[in-house]
Amino acid sequence: MKGDNPFAICGLIMAAVLFLAGCGQKNGENYHPDPAGEVRAETGRCWDAYLEYARGDDVLLPLSRSGTNWYEESLNISPVDAFSSMVVMGLTGKADTILEYVADSVDYVKDFDVKVFEVNIRILGGLVSMYQLSGQKRVLEKARDFGDRLLPAFNSPTGIPYFWVNLKTGEVKGSRVNVAEAGTYLLEMGMLSYFTGDPVYYQAAKRSTRAIYERRSEIGLVGEVIDVETGEWINPSSHICAGIDSYYEYLYKGWLLFGDPELKQMWDESIAAVLRYIPEKRDSLTWYGRVDMHTGEHTSSVVTLWDAFMPSLLAVSGHVEEAEELQRTWDWLWNRYGPEPMIYDYRKDSILNPQYDLNPEIIESAWYLWELTGEQRYMDMLQEYWEDLLEYCRTDVAFTALENVITKEKRDYMATYFLAETLKYFYLAFADQQMYTLKTTVFSTEAHPFLKSALDPERVNRHLGLAPWIDRSG
């Protein structure tokens, strides 16, 4: 390079270094050279905080450095919920500690009522996933025992489970449930049937799902609240919001995981009705509000942050264009407030509940779209969401909820799903790994990974009691 100006060369080199260092930055924000490692470290820090301040309790309260329980006694929800994230992130020591504790010290002979839906997705789902990931027979025994304690709830005239069940006596109560509480059992119960060889669990879940589907309206929509004893609709509002959301999720994912053709038929008809009646355009954005299940007429423009899961479901089921359109709406709401508010009215442009509880749904959807399309804008979203959580929700102990997304006032609660879902989805998005992908794995509504690639199709059919199906719903 005889005759070249050495200072000019140094300048070019420095410019190149600065350019490369800036790759991955968004709008000049802090650059994270190893975001997967950062998420992994933060997960370990949160778990250590749980052990220090809330060991043996269900939930960590980061601001008061204490713990709390859902019911009269602990059900050890945080450890069971957190296990699969520890495995996915390679936090082997922490995973082994949880595994040993659950296998040796946890029991569910508890003389109090529990919410069937909530403990199914967290505890039963966590235990069954724990067994698949570890092969620990004592964990499968715990899962079967817990599943048996939930089964009495399904002994209703319709097959739809009661809201409450006593884990010791099997007594039930609560005859009005929403559709999500009625139809979010197929994955957990199905995996339990697969591993135990007893179809009773999957068949109970499927009977409940079928009971909802067969009560759909003439235009193919379901309502929100139903009476488990009479099968009559109490609330005819139809939507994809909290209260119905995971019913639709499990129709598709149940088929995806187990290949049950009845679920695929239910899904195809259901999603066609949803896409026909529920989306609403407002100022270049697409919202999924609430409609009357019988007429399809829009009745409300109230949405919840849980609804942000829908782009992930649309994307994985092949409706990518609709998924991208809806994700743009939720990203707009996040950008407006930082973390998104819990309840928002899009017609009135009004926040009805300003809390943010470390929810994973928008992160889940951004990861699905990143995984399925490879479009850089979804990675940009994920990086922004992570930076916002670090800025607004991180504490010197762990992470905590926000009381108000406008003021960023913190609230003393770290939901168990933050360990199970939110951190896991961030890690999966940022990490270079091929074990837990959308091709190999079906993630439950609590983000517990079920390895589809490890299931034997013949065993699935036999253990779940799958048989040729005839549509008799009319």
Regions from the PLM with identified roles:
Residues 1-11:
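Bacterial N-terminal signal peptides that target proteins for export
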Residues 11-12, 252:
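Extended rod-forming repeat segments used as scaffolds/tethers
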Residues 12-18:
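Hydrophobic helical h-region of N-terminal Sec-dependent signal peptides
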Residues 20-22:
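C-terminal motif of bacterial Sec signal peptides marking the signal peptidase cleavage site
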Residues 24-474:
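Glycan-recognition and catalytic cores of secretory/periplasmic carbohydrate-active enzymes
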